[in-house]
Design a protein with these regions (language model features):
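Short, solvent-exposed loop/turn and secondary-structure capping segments
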Residues: 9, 34-39, 108, 118-122, ...
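Metal-dependent phosphoesterases centered on the DNase I-like endonuclease/exonuclease/phosphatase
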Residues: 113-231
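Active-site surface patch of divalent metal-dependent phosphodiester/phosphate bond hydrolases
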Residues: 1-64
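Acidic/histidine-rich helix-loop elements
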Residues: 65, 73-77, 117-125
């Protein structure tokens, strides 16, 4: 966007500072000293990242001035600076007292951009924002946080990925395979992602019927637009 022209004049989309951001309210203590943020992590530094291109070409009026179908969305100079996270990625450890002592559960929170509303860049960024957490739980060494600490989640740590990820593992306009790969990873509790503990609701199934939805898992829908995007 153009400097001073909302909502596209910053790293993230918004009509005011903090729009579409998120907050955490916890019954248990948040380990703020060991909370990590990744707001400044650059997209180019994600393993496998490439400059997104214009791939949705049915409406050329949406193309940036002077660009055509197939062009790279960013110049090389822009790509060197652009951030991955459209809002923030946060690892907040929660300290939970148990009869055997304190147990730590890492809340991996984010709100990726929707895979829509432009000509292909958002599709790629949404997938990359979700893939970041997949690589994070694999403790990839290239990851760095906003304080300069490197590496991801240490082996054996408990975690919950949460937030509006804007990506359904089996339906929608996003790159569903990215969420499928995360769900299928042995590091993730398979009873939750592919088994009996997956959150479902009667309301979701009723909504699917009301909207004549073709979603293959209608009782998992979390949004009024008929997709399972919240975790």
């Amino acid at each position: 966007g153009n400097a001073g022209t909302l909502p596209g004049d910053a790293w993230g989309f918004g009509l005011y500072h903090g729009q579409y951001a998120f907050a955490l309210m916890s019954k248990y203590e948040i380990d703020t000293a060991n909370t990590r943020t990744f707001q400044e992590f650059k997209w180019k530094d994600l393993e496998g990242a490439t400059i997104p291109t214009i791939t949705v070409c049915d409406d050329p009026s949406k193309f940036p001035t002077g660009m055509v179908c197939g062009d790279e969305w960013y110049t090389n100079d822009e790509w060197a600076e652009v951030r991955l996270s459209s809002k923030n990625h946060v690892d907040a450890p929660i300290l939970i007292p148990t009869k055997d002592g304190t147990e730590t559960v890492h809340l991996l929170m984010s709100h990726p951009t929707p895979p829509a509303f432009d000509v292909g860049k958002n599709i790629e960024q949404n997938a990359a924002e979700v893939d970041f957490w997949h690589q994070y739980i694999q403790n990839k060494s290239f990851i760095y946080d906003d304080s300069g600490k490197t590496g991801g989640l240490e082996q054996g740590q408990h975690f919950v990925m949460m937030g509006d990820q804007n990506l359904d593992p089996v339906d929608g306009d996003g790159i569903s395979s990215v969420m499928q790969d995360l769900h299928n990873d042995a590091l993730v509790n398979q009873d939750v992602t592919n088994g009996s503990l997956y959150p479902t609701s009667y309301g979701a199934a009723e909504h699917a019927v009301d909207k004549s939805s073709s979603h293959p898992q209608p009782n998992r829908i979390t949004s009024t637009f008929g997709l399972a995007v919240d975790y």
